[in-house]
Amino acid sequence: MRKNTYAMRYVAGQPAERILPPGSFASIGQALPPGEPLSTEERIRILVWNIYKQQRAEWLSVLKNYGKDAHLVLLQEAQTTPELVQFATANYLAADQVPAFVLPQHPSGVMTLSAAHPVYCCPLREREPILRLAKSALVTVYPLPDTRLLMVVNIHAVNFSLGVDVYSKQLLPIGDQIAHHSGPVIMAGDFNAWSRRRMNALYRFAREMSLRQVRFTDDQRRRAFGRPLDFVFYRGLNVSEASVLVTRASDHNPLLVEFSPGKPDK
């Protein structure tokens, strides 16, 4: 699906810009252009949320109350309505969306809002074999104050498929990019891990990429068949705080995680 795969970048005061995938994932292991750090603080705050195409009331108030202080907001099923684009460009330096499919008015897909401009951007799409709808993912990279580069993966995994072949296939290009990246990584989103086989495939991928799972003490994540759908994985960072916000503003609850950029605890 490469020819139809692109990201749209929204920046305040500028026309939307189309970003195509890089020619080679190997470029991520080479010198990337310099940029401003994602955070000047000791902490990196992220919000991860399947926003349900903004179909329910109060989604904007949740973003205003909990998203505006985050350095990164990773949305799934984000529809580029004027209200969401306005919030994104008013509170973040960049907002990158990968349209999974185009609805009658506004495209829907993963969208990453960031407090700094990414120095690398790679949109990805995978088509669901049964419904023929696409799910999207986005890989971006941001400088950190300690000169390291943080890779951020925002993913909405395929939902309707027989077996886990397509599910695992969607993770392959993400794994290729993580493998070429030597710095810290955050991989988060709606993984649709509603079966034991999907969960096993996801955990196997995380182990192969040396990623840890963020644990939530009061775990109010959305579940299907008793299994959580939303996850945050990481490496090269420490988790300072992690919580789940209970809300009716979507069919998923937002995940709030605060990282410290130091070397991870053993």
UniProtKB/Swiss-Prot annotation:
Compartments, record wording: Cytoplasm
GO annotations of cellular component type: cytoplasm
GO molecular function, one term: catalytic activity
Keywords of this entry: Cytoplasm
Entry's family note: Belongs to the UPF0294 family.
Name this polypeptide is given: UPF0294 protein YafD
Lineage, uppermost ranks: Bacteria, Pseudomonadati, Pseudomonadota, Gammaproteobacteria, Enterobacterales
Underlying gene: yafD
